[in-house]
Amino acid sequence: MEPEEERIRYSQRLRGTMRRRYEDDGISDDEIEGKRTFDLEEKLQTNKYNANFVTFMEGKDFNVEYIQRGGLRDPLIFKNSDGLGIKMPDPDFTVNDVKMCVGSRRMVDVMDVNTQKGIEMTMAQWTRYYETPEEEREKLYNVISLEFSHTRLENMVQWPSTVDFIDWVDNMWPRHLKESQTESTNAILEMQYPKVQKYCLISVRGCYTDFHVDFGGTSVWYHIHQGGKVFWLIPPTAHNLELYENWLLSGKQGDIFLGDRVSDCQRIELKQGYTFVIPSGWIHAVYTPTDTLVFGGNFLHSFNIPMQLKIYSIEDRTRVPNKFRYPFYYEMCWYVLERYVYCITNRSHLTKDFQKESLSMDMELNELESGNGDEEGVDREARRMNNKRSVLTSPVANGVNLDYDGLGKACRSLPSLKKTLSGDSSSDSTRGSHNGQVWDPQCSPKKDRQVHLTHFELEGLRCLVDKLESLPLHKKCVPTGIEDEDALIADVKILLEELASSDPKLALTGVPIVQWPKRDKLKFPTRPKVRVPTIPITKPHTMKPAPRLTPVRPAAASPIVSGARRRRVRCRKCKACVQGECGVCHYCRDMKKFGGPGRMKQSCVLRQCLAPRLPHSVTCSLCGEVDQNEETQDFEKKLMECCICNEIVHPGCLQMDGEGLLNEELPNCWECPKCYQEDSSDKAQKRKIEESDEEAVQAKVLRPLRSCEEPLTPPPHSPTSMLQLIHDPVSPRGMVTRSSPGAGPSDHHSASRDERFKRRQLLRLQATERTMVREKENNPSGKKELSEVEKAKIRGSYLTVTLQRPTKELHGTSIVPKLQAITASSANLRPNPRVLMQHCPARNPQHGDEEGLGGEEEEEEEEEEDDSAEEGGAARLNGRGSWAQDGDESWMQREVWMSVFRYLSRKELCECMRVCKTWYKWCCDKRLWTKIDLSRCKAIVPQALSGIIKRQPVSLDLSWTNISKKQLTWLVNRLPGLKDLLLAGCSWSAVSALSTSSCPLLRTLDLRWAVGIKDPQIRDLLTPPTDKPGQDNRSKLRNMTDFRLAGLDITDATLRLIIRHMPLLSRLDLSHCSHLTDQSSNLLTAVGSSTRYSLTELNMAGCNKLTDQTLFFLRRIANVTLIDLRGCKQITRKACEHFISDLSINSLYCLSDEKLIQKIS
């Protein structure tokens, strides 16, 4: 028994450690058994790791010239940050401060130190763990990849200034793409550039990270802000890298300390305040002796390209997933070649759009054509002094810098340049400068010197060209910014030939060759203005949706520039301002005084001011005077805010002809004359087009809403016509008065607008009051009811949705939804309870007409609900988006909608669940979710488990997921009706959850290719559970009809258990079970075995030990319909044909494929 246990232990350890090659990064903790076996404490105390690779330096000596001279090959340690140019937070900066800067909900990758497996936590969870006392921590976790660019923490941390000049991200990647990045996380779909420059590493005492090489061969800068670290360093020689790759592929990382296998290894301790630079390719392991906070970053550079490519190839061979690799690696390589060609030859291979955005080639220079040289020199010097990242440590110049003052002229000729270099252009494209000249990016280039590249750059660029040329077409990853990659490769080859004779001494300039043109002298076009909507001009006024934004033509030049918008304040007079909080809306529930977290910082929905006013502190932008009397009736002395240009002026101060448009809903708001008159012609033309289109749409929508007796054209003052006026999107929500002569409205129309405005205010108040009544059911009479006059105004016209039987022409029994308009006249004539009028059959609305209702009608329908409809039991949508139900109609409505929902896809059902609470419940009906497929999901989150429980599926597919035992146990305890469970590719640690008495009576169980399942595990599944003795002495899998065991390491012992505990089994999958023999077939078909009579389908494909004798045993199966023996090398086709001839006495069988025997029905 001991050799068998040893074999099991070795195979399990091998599988567990192979996961750490990142083939499946989402497995559960229980699955990994390859714990660390070497003594880490002994590795910390021994003296054999005494090699000397690290160089201690001063910050002032770390510059570009140092890297040009040595290529950044040795690890560097700086005991203090003087001269490095780094910036760090205050010494008392804590992990809680990190959480506040990046967000408490930010997801971070956390590594379990014991298993070297990654999990995810929120920053809030991690902070709680970090602040937990050491003795109370159950596990050791380590944060190693919190990238914090584009967060509040970004500006608190600055990397070494020298890194800024050699980092490919800053100098090679198109800068407009980096500037367009807005996402703070490392979501690859939202990433605009390789986001690897700033990392925060947080470790607790005792954390250990095994030997590794940073992704993509990147170099690393590493500053110990708090705590300390211990590093083991292995140089990246060819032999060591080969050992490292074999160590990764061996699956023995937990057993072998790589530092013991190499000839030289150095252990070095970093203390608080140290800055560490790890060059490309260095293999290192890290230990944390005390709780530590580290800031660092990764960067690629041009002085060790061969090593960077070599590490990327190792990642390919070890199959590291994309999540843990350098993003956009080959895209970056293409941009490196393009930048070198451009900076040396002034010839760009970028597309025109990229040239415009990153090189600013179509921009004019401010003082290119005019201005004297002295003024330019003074201005240039001032700008150079303001440049925080200017190189002051290297006085040697490299003649490759561009003539930034002449960039405009040079760039305008670029589109006509050839794709390849020519001999006559070498004098213009190769530039140099005398040694000892101070480097000035603003001065003109010196054309009497040739560019010199270091031998590191020449060798790296050659390797880069060879690598990109050798890639297959689907792996070249040519970015969209490169116009012609073949021409770029050709230009680089010619360039390398011309620069092959570069003088190594002249190349040590201390100045990087590749630099972006400075943008401080470039004129940028102003962005087009966007018309600011009238209603959302201030925050408190949020009762109505904002109109569609429309671009505005640039206004004429004006000496008055007042774009400062003012946040409006409450009027403190309207009903919304004087009432208290409701305590039930989502804003109130968020308030701290009602027990919420207080994140939204919004006022109650019922307290949103209906007419916010300008604050007292605003002044006229022309005269500078405040509004002395806000109650004044003199319009000329009132401060007015333009809803387009946001200018606040007294109308009397404007010395302009013509008048503007007044917003009657919002006080002190108008469209000033200069903004109104400018677009008057365009708006008039647009209004005519929209009115004509809207009339056609309304005619189509309202036609089926009329009853048979109504005329097609309603009277001018009928409720239907009022409905059209209310829904007219051409007129803004806030009606404005046209005060231009000859175009003013009549008194009747003004009264109509006033009446409609008052009615809309009443509708809002009524809707909010009814919401309060419904929320507080224990006090139904707590709110004052609306008067009969107000209800009469509301009943003028509104829409309801009811359910009706189809017309007589449609011979069916289903119930369909119907849209209906209730008019004031019909509402007054109907008794109470009210019966909704039926439409004539000829005018029954079709489905297309129902969909034609726009969002405006839907909003009015929600706002203009009527209490009497609820009393009558009519089914319709109320103001909260839920269904009013009464008696048996509730059940009827549910069944009607269920008949519709069952035709929807899963995605469409999820969309319907967002409509209202009632639809949410209906769409969770288990009849709609009989089968749920979560196969190959990267992570099974608790929300997904809760969703499964709500839907109570019959079939659940969790194949190839990282579900844990705890999660599966929680599921099976709450899914009593589960019949089909698919767990292919899962681990035994999860499948073992089925060995309990709470396991449902399954019909189908799929365990194909599950990890760690052998005969003992199958025994635990099939034997009666022992967790509740005396409850039931039968197997929980006794009702199984389909059992799939493909790819498992099982023997005849499993088959005996199947015969004993599965009397109803009809389909059995034993494919690719290598230990099965002819005797296995004999067991399945022996006299007295249940499978002899119950089996109908048997799959034994890929079982190489089966011979023709198996077919002799399989003849005993009584009701076989399919036998799959494909891939069984020792079974001949002739034997299969004889087998078919013997079976075809009673039924017909055929050999449909090679060794696939099927019954002909």
Curated annotation (Swiss-Prot):
Keywords, comma-separated and alphabetical: ADP-ribosylation, Allosteric enzyme, Biological rhythms, Chromatin regulator, Chromosome, Dioxygenase, DNA-binding, Iron, Isopeptide bond, Leucine-rich repeat, Metal-binding, Nucleus, Oxidoreductase, Phosphoprotein, Repeat, Repressor, Transcription, Transcription regulation, Ubl conjugation, Ubl conjugation pathway, Zinc, Zinc-finger
SMART domains: JmjC, LRR_CC, PHD
Recorded GO MF terms: histone H3K36 demethylase activity; histone H3K36me/H3K36me2 demethylase activity; unmethylated CpG binding; zinc ion binding
Keyword Iron on entry: yes
Cofactor binding, note field: Binds 1 Fe(2+) ion per subunit.
GO cellular component, one term: nucleoplasm
Cofactor(s) recorded in Swiss-Prot or TrEMBL: Fe(2+)
Modified residues (Phosphothreonine): T550, T632, T713
Residue stretches making up the F-box domain: 888-935
Listed CDD domains: CTD_KDM2A (cd21784), F-box_FBXL11 (cd22181), PHD_KDM2A (cd15643)
GO biological process: one example: negative regulation of transcription by competitive promoter binding
UniProt enzyme class: oxidoreductase
EC numbers, comma separated: 1.14.11.27
Localization: Nucleus, Nucleoplasm; Chromosome
Reactions performed catalytically: N(6),N(6)-dimethyl-L-lysyl(36)-[histone H3] + 2 2-oxoglutarate + 2 O2 = L-lysyl(36)-[histone H3] + 2 formaldehyde + 2 succinate + 2 CO2
Cross-link (Glycyl lysine isopeptide (Lys-Gly) (interchain with G-Cter in SUMO2)): K505
Domain JmjC: 148-316
Record keyword DNA-binding present: yes
Positions of Zn(2+) 2 binding: C582, C585, C588, C604
Annotated residues for binding of Zn(2+): C620, C623, C642, C645, H650, C653, C672, C675
UniProt-annotated binding residues for Zn(2+) 1: C571, C574, C577, C609
Description of its domains: The JmjC domain mediates demethylation activity and is required for satellite silencing. The CXXC zinc finger preferentially recognizes nonmethylated CpG DNA, and binding is blocked when the CpG DNA is methylated. It is essential for its ability to repress the transcriptional activator activity of CLOCK-BMAL1 heterodimer.
Family recorded in the similarity comment: Belongs to the JHDM1 histone demethylase family.
Quaternary structure note: Part of a SCF (SKP1-cullin-F-box) protein ligase complex. Interacts with CBX5/HP1A; the interaction promotes CBX5 localization to chromatin. The SKP1-KDM2A complex interacts with UBB.
This protein's name: Lysine-specific demethylase 2A
Species per Swiss-Prot/TrEMBL record: Mus musculus (Mouse)
